[in-house]
C-alpha cells in the first residue's frame, strides 16, 4: 500500500499536515493531497505541493486541463486515505453522506475495502459532543479508522483532549496498519495468547541524584507489544523508564524502575503466561549500598561496590513449563556466537541477536535464531516491521510445536 491520499481540512492543526506529508515521503510513499477551501487559509497549497511533489486538489471546478473524473480517479488511485486534521465538520459530513466539495466527494467514492483514517482534532467540547460520538460510532461500524486526539494546549487556550496526534505518531499508525494488513489474515495463532513483554531500561540508584543505566529507548519492546495486541494477543507490558506512550489495547501496563522490581513483576505474571519476550535492557549490576544523601565530591577516587542483579530471563528459563521464551542478545562482537550461547544457557526457544551500537535507533538489523539453530537475518528495517517479523517467527515455532504434538 504505497499510494496515500492526504485530506487536509480547515482545523488549525492543518499546519501539521506539512510534517505528515514530509514524513510519508521519507518512508517511500506516493502522496497526493486534497485540501478544503478553508484549509488553504491556514496552510498554503504550494507548501504541500512542494513536499508531496504532486499537484494539490482543492476545487471541483478547477479549470486546469485534465481528462479524468478526478474524484473517481483519486479515489481509485489511493491505497490508503488519511484525513488530518479530521474536524467535527468533516466527520459529520462523511457520516451523513454529504459530498459538497472535492474532499467529501472523493471520500464518498472510496471503496469500502480501502482503509480511511481520521486523525481527530477539535475543541474538547466538540470532541465530547454526543452527535460527534454517534457519528464516530456509525463510521467505525462501516470500517473507518480513527486516530484519537491527545491532551494538550488547544488553539482556544483550553488544556484538554482534542489536540491532533503528533505527525510521527500518525505516520507510525499508518506504517503499523500497512505491515499488519499483510499478515492479519494469514495467522490467528496469537489470538487470545497471554504474552508478557519487558521493555525499556532499568535504573539502579547510587544516591538521590545519581544512578546506573543504559541507552535503551524501549522502542523495540513497545513495538512488539503493539504488534502482539494487533494480532489478537492479551499483552502485559512491564516497562522500565522510557519517553514512550503506552501502546493501546494492553491488558496490563506495569511501570518499574530497578532490575529487582522488574524481576518481581515478571515472576508474578510468568506462571499464567503463554509467551515471555524479554526485551528490556536490564542492568547486570546494582550498587551494594544506596546512599541516602548525595555523595560529596572529594580529591580521592570513588569506589562503588556492585553486586549482581538476578538474570530475569535465565531465572524464567529455569521455571519454564509450557511457556515459549524469547530473548535478545545485544552484542559488540561475535554476535551470533554469543547469542547461541545465551539461547542454550537460558533455555530459550528464540533469541534475537543485534549489534549493541544500534541501541536507541529507530531501525536495526537483526538475526532471529531458533532453538533448532535455523535463523533468518532481517536488514535495516524500522522497529515496527521488525516486531511483526519477530512475531511471525514466534508463530512458526508455535505451529511447529503443535504439529509435533499432534
Regions found by a protein language model. Give the residues of each.
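A cross-family phosphate/adenosyl-ligand binding-site feature
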Residues: 1-118, 123-406
Amino acid at each position: 500500500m504505497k499510494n496515500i491520499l492526504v485530506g487536509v481540512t480547515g482545523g488549525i492543526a492543518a499546519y501539521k499536515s506539512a510534517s505528515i506529508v514530509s514524513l510519508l515521503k521519507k518512508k517511500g510513499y506516493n502522496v497526493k493531497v486534497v485540501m478544503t477551501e478553508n484549509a488553504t487559509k491556514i496552510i498554503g497549497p504550494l507548501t504541500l505541493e512542494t513536499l508531496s511533489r504532486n499537484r494539490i486538489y482543492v476545487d471541483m471546478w478547477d479549470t486546469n486541463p485534465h481528462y479524468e473524473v478526478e474524484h473517481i480517479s483519486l479515489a481509485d488511485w489511493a491505497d490508503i486515505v488519511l484525513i488530518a486534521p479530521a474536524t467535527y465538520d468533516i466527520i459529520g459530513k462523511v457520516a451523513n453522506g454529504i459530498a459538497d466539495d472535492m474532499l467529501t466527494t472523493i471520500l464518498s467514492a472510496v471503496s469500502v475495502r480501502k482503509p480511511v483514517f481520521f486523525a481527530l482534532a477539535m475543541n474538547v467540547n466538540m470532541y465530547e459532543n454526543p452527535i460527534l460520538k454517534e457519528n464516530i460510532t456509525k463510521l467505525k461500524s462501516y470500517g473507518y479508522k480513527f486516530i484519537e486526539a491527545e491532551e494538550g494546549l488547544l488553539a482556544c487556550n483550553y488544556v484538554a483532549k482534542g489536540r491532533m496526534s503528533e505527525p510521527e505518531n500518525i505516520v507510525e499508525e499508518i506504517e503499523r496498519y500497512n505491515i499488519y494488513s499483510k499478515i492479519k489474515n494469514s495467522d490467528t495463532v496469537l489470538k487470545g495468547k497471554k504474552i508478557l513483554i519487558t521493555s525499556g531500561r532499568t535504573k539502579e540508584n547510587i544516591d538521590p541524584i545519581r544512578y546506573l543505566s543504559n541507552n535503551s529507548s524501549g522502542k523495540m519492546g513497545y513495538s512488539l507489544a503493539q504488534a502482539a495486541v494487533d494480532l489478537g494477543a492479551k499483552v502485559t507490558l512491564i516497562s522500565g523508564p522510557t519517553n514512550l506512550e503506552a501502546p493501546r489495547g494492553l491488558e496490563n501496563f506495569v511501570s518499574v524502575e530497578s532490575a529487582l522490581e522488574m524481576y518481581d513483576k515478571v515472576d508474578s505474571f510468568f506462571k499464567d503466561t503463554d509467551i515471555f519476550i524479554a526485551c528490556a535492557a536490564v542492568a547486570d549490576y546494582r550498587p551494594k549500598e544506596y546512599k541516602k544523601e548525595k555523595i560529596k565530591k572529594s580529591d580521592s577516587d570513588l569506589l562503588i561496590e556492585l553486586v549482581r542483579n538476578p538474570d530475569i530471563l535465565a531465572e524464567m528459563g529455569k521455571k519454564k513449563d509450557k511457556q515459549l521464551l524469547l530473548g535478545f542478545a545485544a552484542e559488540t562482537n561475535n554476535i551470533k556466537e554469543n547469542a547461541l550461547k545465551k539461547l542454550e544457557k537460558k533455555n530459550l526457544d528464540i533469541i534475537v541477536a543485534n549489534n549493541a551500537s544500534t541501541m536507541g535507533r529507530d531501525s536495526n538489523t537483526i538475526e532471529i535464531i531458533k532453538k533448532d539453530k535455523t535463523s533468518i537475518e532481517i536488514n535495516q528495517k524500522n522497529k515496527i516491521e521488525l516486531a511483526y517479523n519477530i512475531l511471525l517467527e514466534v508463530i512458526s515455532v508455535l505451529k511447529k510445536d503443535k504439529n509435533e504434538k499432534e
